């Protein structure tokens, strides 16, 4: 059975007080979940949150540089994340691609470095409005170039159609399910059926407590990468209750 996830990507939101309060409130909830639940705060909050976070939550970075150290102003390396006990990272989010001009070649280097270091990585992929779904195969092929099958065990994929991120629009459950099924077929082409059947593929793009239940019943969807709706503890707990 594939591992299920609910991950909140906080982007550039929350001050430290609010971030700590969120974690404390979540951890006061003593429910047992069948899915792995995680949060991705900003870099500067990771150390403090690491001090208080329990095993009930996974702690993700929002990005990780493939350079171990050196003259690369403004970046944080995968080794520095591991040094503070953060072993999970989102890579290739569409906002990184859009605002920081990240190419699939750069994403590939980040993936290789993180996966080789046994970090868990959520690779984000998605097509723009008007792009053919086949774009996803090209993007996957480029991002996963040089990534050996032995490294894939720590990889999770998040399908986030660009037209749905932060817009309030979401793919219908049927469309999201079919697209993720197609992504599995692409993974099968790149690796094999076993990898395709066992890799967890999440959906992201305007997921909230109102629509998560209809998406969650889809066979191919193994969880969710949630943006804005993960910022409020009440909403996030409701999504966890409904899904996880």
Swiss-Prot record:
One of its GO terms (biological process) is glycerol catabolic process. GO terms for cellular component: cytosol. PROSITE patterns: TIM_1 (PS00171), TIM_2 (PS51440). The active site is at residues 93, 160. It catalyses: D-glyceraldehyde 3-phosphate = dihydroxyacetone phosphate. Substrate binds at residues 9-11, 166, 206. It holds the Pfam family TIM. Keywords: Cytoplasm, Gluconeogenesis, Glycolysis, Isomerase. InterPro entries: Aldolase_TIM, TIM_sf, TrioseP_Isoase_bac/euk, Triosephosphate_isomerase, Triosephosphate_isomerase_AS. Involved in the gluconeogenesis. Catalyzes stereospecifically the conversion of dihydroxyacetone phosphate (DHAP) to D-glyceraldehyde-3-phosphate (G3P). PANTHER family: TRIOSEPHOSPHATE ISOMERASE. This is Triosephosphate isomerase. The gene is tpiA.
């Amino acid at each position: 059975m594939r591992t299920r996830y609910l991950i909140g990507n906080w982007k550039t939101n929350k001050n430290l007080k609010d971030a700590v309060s969120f974690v404390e409130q979540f951890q006061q909830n003593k429910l047992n979940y069948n899915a792995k639940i995680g949060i991705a705060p900003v870099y500067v909050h990771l150390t403090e949150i690491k001090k208080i976070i329990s095993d009930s939550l996974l702690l993700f970075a929002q990005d990780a540089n493939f350079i171990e150290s050196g003259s690369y102003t403004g970046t944080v390396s995968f080794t520095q994340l591991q040094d503070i006990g953060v072993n999970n990272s989102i890579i290739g989010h569409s906002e990184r691609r859009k605002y920081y001009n990240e190419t699939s070649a750069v994403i590939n280097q980040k993936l290789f470095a993180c996966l080789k270091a046994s970090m868990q990585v959520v690779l984000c992929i998605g097509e723009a409005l008007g792009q053919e779904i086949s774009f996803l195969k090209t993007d996957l092929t480029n991002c996963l170039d040089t990534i050996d099958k032995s490294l894939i065990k720590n990889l999770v994929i998040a399908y986030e159609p660009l037209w749905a991120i932060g817009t309030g629009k979401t793919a219908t459950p049927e469309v999201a399910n079919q697209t993720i099924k197609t992504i599995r077929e692409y993974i099968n082409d790149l690796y094999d059926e076993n990898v395709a059947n066992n890799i967890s593929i999440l959906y992201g793009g305007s997921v909230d407590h109102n629509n998560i239940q209809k998406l969650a019943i889809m066979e191919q969807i193994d969880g969710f990468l949630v943006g804005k709706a993960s910022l409020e503890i009440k909403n996030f707990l409701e999504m966890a209750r409904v899904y996880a």
